[in-house]
């Protein structure tokens, strides 16, 4: 009995470690994306990221095939469209127009937005403290967007449009999560995530290829996919974004969440906005004004309040 209890404790410890590592890797996603965006446009960067993610999810695709009905395929394709091209193109076009620290703080509102969406669309109960947390998170986001320091010692400055694009990507992510939840009633989270990543990556390929082929018609300046002139730094950033920040985090989170209480594991989602904003300030020379710091504290405080009170926000289906 003692040995069994010790083994259970070790598994639980590893589960917390897996969730913490996933949250930490998620927190670096905007930083690596910013490095890659110095050498290519958003569409190319997101495509490369998910091509690397496909490599990381290959064992799941090869080892755990799923039989989807025609209706499930339609839901899957809609889920992939929301979850990959629409969400990430909006998010990183926003990052181009704002800073890593601002974008990271915005993402901190995700647990609260998810709880609100579950209450509105899925009939889950959100108590008075939950609604207060939602109001605090909304006020915090408004303070970051409208009251943040528009001056920075780095190369980028935050803008209202950039911050709003990041917020729009979070709303798109809510639609993706609610659709994914339906698929996960009959299929495991890793399988649904793998199929979503592969389907969404094919959509990104079609978008990039179609934009390039239609260049003579649209008269837009579309550059070919960069290869030879991409630096080693950018390739490393892209590989880390896809293999570690997307594929590995998904597998770590899905394993960890099944060995620890969901309400406790959810707190590790809050590592992402905190670490992301720190990386932006410390490594990229960005600055946050006093209102942005206060707004960020409200966002994180609201998220921690929800994720430590036992309210399950379905963190197993979150994809970064």
Language-model region placement:
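Juxtamembrane helix-entry segments on the extracytoplasmic side of multipass membrane proteins
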Residues: 11-16, 39-43, 47, 68-74, ...
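Juxtamembrane helix-loop boundary signature in multi-pass membrane transporters
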Residues: 1-21, 66, 109-171, 291, ...
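Transmembrane alpha-helices of multi-pass small-molecule transport proteins
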Residues: 14-15, 38-86, 113-117, 171-179, ...
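Specific transmembrane alpha-helical segments of multi-pass solute transporters/efflux pumps
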Residues: 24-30, 58-107, 117, 143, ...
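Helix-helix packing/entry segments at the starts of transmembrane helices
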Residues: 46-48, 102-110, 178-202, 238, ...
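Specific alpha-helical transmembrane segments that line the substrate/conduction pathway
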Residues: 44-55, 83, 88, 92-134, ...
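Transmembrane alpha-helical segments that form core, pore/gating elements
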Residues: 23, 31, 54-57, 114-116, ...
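Cytoplasmic-side transmembrane-helix entry/capping segments in multi-pass membrane proteins
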Residues: 19, 71-80, 126-139, 187-196
């Amino acid at each position: 009995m003692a040995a069994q209890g010790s083994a259970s404790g070790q598994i639980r410890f590893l589960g917390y470690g897996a969730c913490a590592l996933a949250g930490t890797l998620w927190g670096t996603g905007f930083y690596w994306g910013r490095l890659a965006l110095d050498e290519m446009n958003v569409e190319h960067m997101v495509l490369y990221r998910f091509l690397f993610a496909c490599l990381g999810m290959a064992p799941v695709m090869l080892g755990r095939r799923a039989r989807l009905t025609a209706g499930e395929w339609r839901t899957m394709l809609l889920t992939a469209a929301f979850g990959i091209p629409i969400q990430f193109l909006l998010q990183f076009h926003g990052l181009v127009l704002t800073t890593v620290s601002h974008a990271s703080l915005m993402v901190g509102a995700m647990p609260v937005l998810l709880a609100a969406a579950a209450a509105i669309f899925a009939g889950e109960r959100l108590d008075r403290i939950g609604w207060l947390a939602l109001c605090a998170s909304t006020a915090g986001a408004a303070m970051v967007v409208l009251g943040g320091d528009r001056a920075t010692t780095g190369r980028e400055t935050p803008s209202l449009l950039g911050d709003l694009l990041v917020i729009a990507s979070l709303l798109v992510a809510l639609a993706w999560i609610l659709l994914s939840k339906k698929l996960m009633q009959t299929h495991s989270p890793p399988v649904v995530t793998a199929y979503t990543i592969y389907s969404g990556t094919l959509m990104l390929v079609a978008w990039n290829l179609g934009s390039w082929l239609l260049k003579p018609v649209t008269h837009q300046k579309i550059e070919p996919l960069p290869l030879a002139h991409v630096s080693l730094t950018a390739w490393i950033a892209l590989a880390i974004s896809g293999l570690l920040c997307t594929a590995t985090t998904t597998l770590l989170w899905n394993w960890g969440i099944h060995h620890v209480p969901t309400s406790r594991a959810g707190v590790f989602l809050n590592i992402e906005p905190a670490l992301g904003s720190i990386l932006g300030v410390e490594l990229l020379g960005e600055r946050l004004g006093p209102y942005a710091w206060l707004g960020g504290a409200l966002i994180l405080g609201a998220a921690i309040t929800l994720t430590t009170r036992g309210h399950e926000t379905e963190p197993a289906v979150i994809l970064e």
